[in-house]
Amino acid sequence: MSREMGELTQTRLQKIWIPHSSSSSLLQRRRGSSIPQFTNSPTMVIMVGLPARGKTYISTKLTRYLNWIGTPTKVFNLGQYRREAVSYRNYEFFRPDNMEAQLIRKQCALAALKDVHKYLSREEGHVAVFDATNTTRERRSLILQFAKEHGYKVFFIESICNDPDIIAENIKQVKLGSPDYIDCDQEKVLEDFLKRIECYEINYQPLDEELDSHLSYIKIFDVGTRYMVNRVQDHVQSRTAYYLMNIHVTPRSIYLCRHGESELNLRGRIGGDSGLSARGKQYAYALANFIRSQSISSLKVWTSHMKRTIQTAEALGVPYEQWKALNEIDAGVCEEMTYEEIQEHYPEEFALRDQDKYRYRYPKGESYEDLVQRLEPVIMELERQENVLVICHQAVMRCLLAYFLDKSSDELPYLKCPLHTVLKLTPVAYGCRVESIYLNVEAVNTHRDKPENVDITREPEEALDTVPAHY
């Protein structure tokens, strides 16, 4: 093999090396050509559909999910680019015969695609969600050519809805609060937005089963009453399609809480499978009274397999379902130890966990990263359900809360989930509304903040600086 043939050049795509050729380098390709598409090439998720079809809702939820499972993902909302370029006046900006506006909109799309390239090829992103109408074949061809030039995979998500009640509700919930309509009369907003939809309908070209048979896509009809999936290419696209087939928009609330205070909580010991303390039992009855006062229709109750969650649920006097996936994080060799004992016997492990709490795995135990993977089926079922009460544990509750509140892996292990407090999560248009309800039963504090000094050579006093008081 010649020296030239043996050289490898790293492309801007993550961790991909290709043979170097001095005569026709792929890195110096001419415009319009393409680079190879590898198995782990980044993916562009392209939204398609008329306005008020839930595209931004889908984009936001999908991005939150993919980030939660560890796939770096970012939304690029074309409406934001357009608002930065020009102030909105009325629906006439979207008329197909408004050539000046058409040019502005195309320039905004190109600016967004430039940022997509920066994110996927330079900032270690793996999935870019291009949130726009993309209703014409011309616009989709532009995006496909862009993806081909940079070696990205493409997966289309088309949301189709012909139910006028669903469309009207979407306009009411989302568009009335849009930056395009600040301080506008509600009736005028509705009138203008319906005319905007009419502008798009003139040139709308849905994905076609025959003409687009070579493309990868999922079509969602009437917010999930029917799906059509075509040519799923890889793991990311498969998980995306599966996730989208599990979400719904039915109004509901999810109640998250920890078990009542346990005997090991009182003694400052982590893990184990102890029963409730006297105050923990008092909380269990307080929780039962609270749930009854809420008059929640068709409530499902989930617990872990551990004694303390089961004892808490028993006080409710209703059927409950046990999930092994909801068990507390496995602390391995550190099970039932206090933080002081861990520092004494495993000072290096204690410091390593403080350095990267999300990825650190207890010897013979689990990490938060492991726990997220274990909880993915729970998240899928929560998305499918309506009203649910989940009685779980501190680390588990942190993982679930991070999903619903879109928290990063750095934030996740330090989310505060105190004992004897219920969090009521109500999904709204682009996020989740949180209500914290303390049930007025005292309990020990089990939250430990990250200490300032996380070095392995630190003094024991520095390592234990943030340990909460216990008996």
Curated annotation (Swiss-Prot):
Activity regulation behaviour: Phosphorylation at Ser-33 inhibits the kinase and activates the bisphosphatase.
Enzyme Commission number, as recorded: 2.7.1.105, 3.1.3.46
Known catalytic reactions: beta-D-fructose 2,6-bisphosphate + H2O = beta-D-fructose 6-phosphate + phosphate; beta-D-fructose 6-phosphate + ATP = beta-D-fructose 2,6-bisphosphate + ADP + H(+)
This protein's UniProt keywords: Acetylation, ATP-binding, Hydrolase, Kinase, Multifunctional enzyme, Nucleotide-binding, Phosphoprotein, Transferase
Residues annotated for beta-D-fructose 2,6-bisphosphate binding in this entry: R258, N265, G271, R308, Y339, R353, K357, Y368, Q394, R398
Active site per UniProt: D131, C161, H259, E328
Gene3D superfamilies recorded: P-loop containing nucleotide triphosphate hydrolases, Phosphoglycerate mutase-like
Cellular component GO terms held in the UniProt record: 6-phosphofructo-2-kinase/fructose-2,6-biphosphatase complex; cytosol
Modification Phosphoserine occurs at: S33, S141
Protein family membership: In the C-terminal section; belongs to the phosphoglycerate mutase family.
Protein name as annotated: 6-phosphofructo-2-kinase/fructose-2,6-bisphosphatase 1
Gene this chain is encoded by: Pfkfb1
